[in-house]
Swiss-Prot record:
Residues reported in the UniProt entry to bind Mg(2+): D8, E59
Catalytic activity line of the entry: apo-[ACP] + CoA = holo-[ACP] + adenosine 3',5'-bisphosphate + H(+)
Entry-linked HAMAP family: AcpS
Chief place of localization: cytoplasm
Annotated source species: Staphylococcus carnosus (strain TM300)
Name of the featured protein: Holo-[acyl-carrier-protein] synthase
Function as written in the Swiss-Prot or TrEMBL entry: Transfers the 4'-phosphopantetheine moiety from coenzyme A to a Ser of acyl-carrier-protein.
Transmembrane segments: none
Organism superkingdom: Bacteria
Subcellular location per the Swiss-Prot or TrEMBL entry: Cytoplasm
MF (Gene Ontology): holo-[acyl-carrier-protein] synthase activity; magnesium ion binding
Length: 117
């Protein structure tokens, strides 16, 4: 049974600006595994795209959960990884999580569907 659906869209330029102003931004948003992948990218544009995509994914997840980010779930509670084919996934107890992340030159977007197990 579908529990919730969330979607988020963010400007990559906004994330780039925040990255310049707040050097610890990636550490605040990304899990340890995500941060390792982020740091493997050598180009700042790719880093911004990745961070924007993960930010959108986590926002979409929190919207699907119905709580938003804050008291009940934080950025660090949501760990979005990629499987061997590159598909994003999130494991969250009690739910099957369907994740989609996309990028254009200027935007990153994500949709998350939660199924109650």
């Amino acid at each position: 049974m579908i529990y919730g659906i969330g979607i988020d869209l963010i400007e990559i330029g906004r994330i780039k600006t925040l990255m310049e102003r707040q050097k610890k931004l990636p550490e605040r948003i990304l899990s340890k595994d995500e941060l390792t992948k982020f740091e493997s990218f050598s180009h700042e544009q790719r880093r911004a795209e990745f961070l924007a995509g993960r930010f959108a994914c986590k926002e979409a997840f929190s919207k699907a959960l119905g709580t938003g980010l804050g008291k009940h779930v934080s950025f660090q509670d949501i760990n979005c990884q990629n499987d061997e084919l590159g598909r994003p996934y999130i494991r969250y107890e009690g739910f099957k999580v369907h994740v989609s992340i996309t990028h254009t030159e200027n935007y990153a977007a994500s949709q998350v569907i939660l199924e109650k197990m």
